[in-house]
Amino acid sequence: MDMWDTPVLETERLLLRPFTEDDLPAVFAIFSDREVNRFLPWFPVRTMEEAESFFQERYAAAYRDRSAWKFAICLKRDDIPIGYVTLSGDDSHDLGYGLRRESWGMGIATEAGQAVIRQAGAGGLPYLTATHDRENPRSGRVMARLGMSYRYSYQEQWQPKNIPVIFRLYQLDLDGQRERTYRKYWDQSAVHFVEKEII
């Protein structure tokens, strides 16, 4: 099995697995909600056809190319996706997640993230990063609960929404090398700084 084949993972409450075309109604429900997608780098889908295109471009292609882990987050009791958690295969090893609103505040993103982190450690990844919009501190609290630490903030002109966004980068070192910081976003951004009150 290739390192970047999305595996199936289980936790106490959750089943993490690849999305399939049978999940398109759930894909639509997750990615059509404006509030769920408010801080994400895409516009909400408006039709089932857009949901299918979104699935093909962002999920099926990653499964085919083995370029990232892209999990559907499902409750074990019904195996219906209520969100997603991803880990990129590039050098950022970026962790991302999102949930339908009715599943917020239940610790599900943290539980799913912990499972992905365990799998990443077993696979030998040295570190993971994650970023969140400064206007979305809820996501930063998930990162902190996952054991990640804040490293720096940077500004990016976010596409396709074409808006300036301040992001905070968090990092988790899985190999014990805590002095290392993933610097790509810092180096690429003309506006970067450390928010002392977060450290």
Where does each model-flagged region fall?
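Conserved GNAT-fold acetyl-CoA-binding loop/helix
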Residues: 35-57
